[in-house]
Amino acid sequence: MPVMDIQQIWDILPHRYPMLLVDRIEELEEERVVGIKNVTINEPFFTGHFPDIPVMPGVMIIEAMAQVAGILVLSSIPDRKNKLVLLAAVNEAKFRRPVVPGDQLRIEMKVIKRKSTIAKMNGVATVNGLVVAEAEMMCKLADRTDRV
């Protein structure tokens, strides 16, 4: 049973179709989260990437990782309706295997360091236990009313 279903994810993240890239949260701890993205042929990016050989763009995998990280950060904040988590940096991104329609992307994000409005995390995305991508990222907590 998921820790968060899509309804609960909608309550935390501002993203909606076609940019919402998290279907459920399976594990949620203070410094760690595991999210799932079910990759289907209906994803809009498959129309052009690539028409005859659909492969999920690496940048979309990074975005899915950032959204899972955002859920970790926002889940512990009481006034989260007034907050956004912005991606501030991506380092050491590596793409090991292609992600294709039918894959279930399992994303694990762990906090390395956290300050008042900044969180640095390591992330690993897997399909069937095989690493498909990994990255270190930094997220910034901001007010929704701030100009970004």
Set out the residue ranges of the language-model regions.
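Conserved positions in beta-strands of structured domains
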Residues: 23-26, 91, 96, 108-112, ...
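HotDog/MaoC-like acyl-thioester-processing domains
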Residues: 32, 100-103, 110-148
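Flexible, low-complexity linker/boundary loops enriched in proline and small hydrophobic residues
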Residues: 2-24, 138
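Hydrophobic beta-strand-centered segment that forms part of the acyl-chain substrate-binding groove
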Residues: 1-3, 69-106, 132-134, 139-140
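Short solvent-exposed loop/turn micro-motifs enriched in small/polar/acidic residues
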Residues: 18-19, 92, 104, 116-118
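Active-site helix/loop of acyl-thioester processing domains in fatty-acid/polyketide metabolism
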Residues: 25, 56-79
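Catalytic strand-loop segment that frames the active site of acyl-thioester-processing enzymes
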Residues: 17-56
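Beta-strand-rich interaction surfaces with strong enrichment in secreted/lumenal proteins
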Residues: 10, 52, 95-97
